[in-house]
């Protein structure tokens, strides 16, 4: 580096600029497919090897180019789609900047072969090798254009090393091609990976036919029609399809939204779709959507890869999409049959009807139904004497009798924390026992604590009670501690499950069959080795995964959605250690479901048992999803909050004492 300012050479400028357009193989595929669609193609065939890192081929039967046009097409900012700046406001094509072929040729070896329609049998070919364009030569080719890309980032190793595993890169390619296939149902679109066809749409013009090809029969049959003419002046029409609330996935990637025919990943549109479902979706589940928004006042020139747009009337667009989705679901009479697996918000376990602490104590003293009461809708709710899911209630590994026995007094009545009943001896004292015991004094975990002194431990606590039946309130040596009972119990369940994962499998009585989308099926074999490390035994027949054995620790809890989420964890992984990451994600979800929920009143013994179990964890300070389990407020902060340190405070106290 020198201190002098100088102009960069053209090759360097081209490679820097290419980084804004070509980020990964999927970026190349996106640009080339857009060119094919803009050329009026009736069929577009995409083929990639090793997720596109080795080779990409996009072939179409569009208008094609002459030799002279081909020579111009690989130059910078050359296009047939835009004349001048005045056309930017009303651009009607997917591409318009004239950058695609030039930027791809700057960072890869690019070969374009083309022939215009009704132009004889001879076409033209040109090769661009990392910015070095050759001459145009005659070549035989059917009407249309074929673009081949190899050695992507071959001369920019710093860029290539940031590419992910082939399965991950193919996931991005599949997502891009899928969206164009859904957005253009009148075009026959096919995708091939490593010589194997992933999907092929028929080009009939029916979006449901396209969805059947890429998502499978289960999803296609669940799609509900959205067709609305909104009141907003800026929105002409909202149309497409959304899935039943019960047909969901654990990621947002199946929310496909299009603005004026262009695929976009706009947060406003995605949130509007989710809001249209109201409370029919759990927070961690996302529907399928193929939704088109035709509107005015859209700026598509705000993102290098045109993935985002800017709306003049953002609020009007959001309201129109939300209303369209909501009306479609209402017209279909769809209501959620039950909460999907994995709901983890404290409110999901709200007890109804609500009672005050006095009401609950009175009910307990009166010998209420300890098994729970009906809420009028066929759902059972925890009665005042129940502890819901105690810290040792599911995936039991020992100590369950003690925790269960401590949940109620001997006469069957229920005591709240703070009632003065005696609890078992340990580091976490019941309210009646004002003296705190030193670390390790008593309790079944004392011996273990000596051998695990390096792990984190909770401070000595004296339980004061529960706040809103959601947080345990306790006094620490220097301040106040709040414990989130749901997050704490999640951590306990998670570490117990983690200790039981050993790769052992358990055969299923009847094989579980799971219909996959085209993208999931395409990478199934790549993920199979990792799945077997976890204890799964499965095979793929067409689009159906047949699971014959599962990890022993999951045998009692496995369902179709959980199995699908395991696969999704492998697909989403990008750091080279998918097995451990997938296992942790699954265990975290499993730990969530049986954990004590918010708005659940706990018996005094259960609170102490929960704190003992949390203290025995390797990491007692966070749930497996990363949320804190405890919040500490020390004495200094309390004093500051009450302004006990303001100037003259001590002197005024002395004066008051003298009076």
From Swiss-Prot:
Residues 352-362 have a biased composition (Basic and acidic residues). SMART domains: DNA_mis_repair, MutL_C. Residues 338-459 are annotated as: Disordered. GO terms for cellular component: mismatch repair complex. Keywords: DNA damage, DNA repair. GO terms for biological process: mismatch repair. InterPro entries: DNA_mismatch_repair_CS, DNA_mismatch_repair_MutL, DNA_mismatch_S5_2-like, HATPase_C_sf, MutL/Mlh/PMS, MutL/Mlh/Pms-like, MutL_C, MutL_C_dimsub. Residues 374-391 have a biased composition (Polar residues). Disulfide bonds: none annotated. One of its GO terms (molecular function) is ATP-dependent DNA damage sensor activity. Belongs to the DNA mismatch repair MutL/HexB family. HAMAP family: DNA_mis_repair. NCBIfam families: mutl. This protein is involved in the repair of mismatches in DNA. It is required for dam-dependent methyl-directed DNA mismatch repair. May act as a 'molecular matchmaker', a protein that promotes the formation of a stable complex between two or more DNA-binding proteins in an ATP-dependent manner without itself being part of a final effector complex. This is DNA mismatch repair protein MutL.
